[in-house]
Regions:
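Long extracytoplasmic/lumenal interhelical loops at the membrane interface
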Residues: 271-288, 292, 296, 300-340, ...
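N-terminal signal-anchor transmembrane segment
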Residues: 2-69, 88-97, 381-383, 440, ...
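Alpha-helical transmembrane segments of multi-pass inner-membrane proteins
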Residues: 60, 92, 116, 131-162, ...
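A membrane-periplasm/extracellular boundary helix in multi-pass inner-membrane enzymes
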Residues: 147-152, 214, 232-278, 291-296, ...
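A conserved mid-to-late transmembrane alpha helix and its immediate loop/hinge
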Residues: 209, 216-218, 321-359, 383
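Aromatic-anchored transmembrane helix interface
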Residues: 55-59, 80-87, 101-123, 133-138, ...
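Hydrophobic transmembrane alpha-helices and their immediate junctions
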Residues: 123, 200, 229, 241, ...
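Transmembrane alpha-helices of multi-pass inner-membrane enzymes
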Residues: 374-438, 452
C-alpha cells in the first residue's frame, strides 16, 4: 500500500497567540494610547506637560524591543509600511509650511513610533488573537473605570460640564465610551470566532456595554450598535446558509439605502429623534468656520498637529467666530484638511479604502477566523470619523487599530501543507488485509474455546 497523506492547516512562522509576556507588553502600549489614567492625573487641565511626555519614553523603548523581536514577521506587511510611510512623509514635509514647526516635527516622530507599533500589532496578533488582546485590555480598563467612579468620583465622574456623567479613567465621557465600544465589539468578535473562554468574552461584552450606556455618549452608543450588529449579522448569515445570506444582504442594502435617503431628505428630524441638537451642539458652526480657513490654504493646510495650538492665529479666529473655546474640529476629515489640505485628506482616504477593500475580499477567510472584527471596527471607525478627530493622529487608539487592520489584511495566510502519515508496513513485517475469498479452504473459522 502506498503512502497516505492528510492535509493539516498550518501557518508556518505565524503565531496564533503570542506568549503572555508579549500580550502584557502590547496591552500596556494600548492602555497608553487610550490616554487613560496618567493623563487626567498628571495633566488635569488637558495640557501637554514635560512630565506627560516622559511617560511615553518606556512606551517607545518597549515598541522598539517588540519590533526587533518580531522583525521577520512584521516585514511581511511591507505594503502597509509603504502606505504608512507615504503618510508620514507628507506629515513630516508639512513642517516646512507649518505655523508651529516644532510641534509638527515632534508629533511626526511620535506618530512614526506609534505607527510602527500599529503595524507590529496587526502582523503579529493574527486571527482572533488581536480582538482577544483588545477585549482583555479593555476589560481591565473597565474594572479600573468602575473603581474610579465609586472610589474616586472626582476623577471618574464629571464635576462641572456634563456633571454626574461617568468618564472613568479619561478626561471625557466620550473617550470612555469609545474605548468601551472597542472592548465590546472585540468581545463580540471573540464569541463569533468561537473563543475558548466564552465566559470572559460575555463578561467583557456586558461590562463594556454597560459603561457605554453610563457615559451617555450617543455617538458611542451608535458605534456600539453598528459594530456589534455587524459581527452578529455576519455570524448569523454564515450559520444560516446561502438562502439566509442572500436575504440578509438584500435586507442590509435596502436598510442602508433607506437610512441614507431619510438622512439626506430630513437629517434634522433624525437628529431630533435621537435627542441631538440639529446643529450637532454647535458643530456645524465650527465646520463652517473651519472650511473658511481651509479655503485660505487648500493645498497645504497649516501643518500637522499645528492648527489647534494655544497661540494659533487661525484657531483663534474659529474660537472667536463660534464664541466657544473649540478644542478640535469634531470631524476627522475637516481636521485633516486644516492640517494637510486636500492632498492629505485624499491620501488618508486612499489608505482607508485599501484597508476596506482587502477586509471585504477576505471576509470568508480572515474575517471568519477573527469573528469579523476588522470589518466591524472599520465600520465603527468610519462612523466615528464624521464626529471625532480620529484620522492620522500621533497617539490615539482609533488610528492605531485602523493601521493594524491594514497590516493584518496585507499579510496572506501561508499555504496549507500536507503532512505525510507513516508508510504502510512492508511485506516482510506486516500482513495485508484479507477477505474471505483469499483463503483456499473458505473463510477462516476459529474453534470455540471450551471450558472444563
Amino acid at each position: 500500500m502506498g503512502a497516505m497523506a492528510v492535509v493539516h492547516p498550518s501557518r508556518s512562522g505565524e503565531i496564533a497567540d503570542p506568549p503572555a509576556w508579549e500580550r502584557l507588553a502590547a496591552g500596556f502600549v494600548l492602555f497608553m494610547l487610550t490616554g487613560a489614567l496618567l493623563a487626567p492625573v498628571l495633566a488635569p487641565d488637558q495640557s501637554e506637560t514635560p512630565i506627560l511626555r516622559l511617560t511615553w519614553l518606556p512606551v517607545y523603548a518597549l515598541t522598539a524591543g517588540l519590533m526587533a523581536l518580531r522583525f521577520e514577521r512584521i516585514i511581511k506587511a511591507w505594503p502597509a509600511w509603504l502606505l504608512a510611510g507615504l503618510l508620514l512623509a507628507l506629515a513630516f514635509a508639512s513642517k516646512y509650511w507649518s505655523i508651529d514647526p516644532e510641534v509638527t516635527q515632534r508629533r511626526v516622530i511620535a506618530m512614526a513610533i506609534n505607527t510602527s507599533f500599529a503595524l507590529y500589532l496587526g502582523a503579529v496578533f493574527r486571527d482572533s488573537a488581536l480582538p482577544r488582546l483588545l477585549m482583555q485590555t479593555c476589560l481591565v480598563m473597565a474594572v479600573g473605570s468602575l473603581i474610579m467612579v465609586f472610589a474616586y468620583p472626582q476623577i471618574g465622574v464629571h464635576q462641572a460640564d456634563n456633571a454626574g456623567m461617568w468618564r472613568g479613567l479619561w478626561y471625557e465621557k466620550n473617550q470612555m465610551g469609545l474605548v468601551m465600544v472597542v472592548g465590546a465589539v472585540s468581545a463580540a468578535a471573540c464569541l463569533a470566532a468561537g473563543d475558548r473562554r466564552p465566559w470572559t468574552a460575555l463578561i467583557a461584552l456586558g461590562l463594556c456595554s454597560l459603561l457605554v450606556l453610563a457615559s451617555q455618549s450617543k455617538t458611542s452608543l451608535l458605534c456600539l450598535l453598528l459594530g456589534s450588529g455587524f459581527v452578529g449579522g455576519l455570524w448569523a448569515l454564515r450559520r444560516g446558509g446561502a438562502v439566509l445570506t442572500v436575504a440578509g444582504l438584500w435586507g442590509g442594502v435596502l436598510l442602508a439605502g433607506g437610512a441614507a435617503w431619510i438622512w439626506f431628505v430630513d437629517s434634522a428630524a433624525v437628529l431630533t429623534a435621537l435627542g441631538k441638537d440639529p446643529s450637532l451642539t454647535g458643530r456645524t458652526l465650527i465646520w463652517e468656520s473651519l472650511m473658511r480657513r481651509v479655503a485660505e490654504r487648500p493645498w497645504t493646510g497649516y501643518g500637522f498637529s499645528a492648527f489647534w495650538g494655544r497661540d494659533s492665529v487661525p484657531a483663534a479666529f474659529v474660537r472667536q467666530e463660534t464664541a466657544w473655546p473649540v478644542p478640535s474640529a469634531h470631524n476627522g476629515w475637516i481636521d485633516l484638511l486644516v492640517q494637510l489640505g486636500w492632498p492629505g485628506a485624499v491620501a488618508v482616504g486612499v489608505v482607508i479604502a485599501v484597508a476596506v477593500v482587502l477586509v471585504v475580499l477576505r471576509l470568508d477567510g480572515m474575517g471568519a477566523r477573527e469573528g469579523y472584527w476588522s470589518g466591524a471596527y472599520l465600520a465603527v471607525f468610519l462612523l466615528l470619523s464624521l464626529s471625532e478627530s480620529v484620522l492620522l493622529n500621533h497617539a490615539s487608539l482609533p488610528w492605531t487599530l485602523m493601521l493594524a487592520i491594514l497590516s493584518r489584511a496585507v499579510i496572506f495566510d501561508a499555504p496549507q501543507k500536507s503532512a505525510a502519515l507513516a508508510r504502510a508496513p512492508s511485506e516482510a513485517y506486516g500482513n495485508r488485509l484479507r477477505i474471505a475469498s483469499d483463503y483456499v479452504n473458505g473463510p477462516a473459522r476459529r474453534r470455540p474455546v471450551r471450558l472444563l
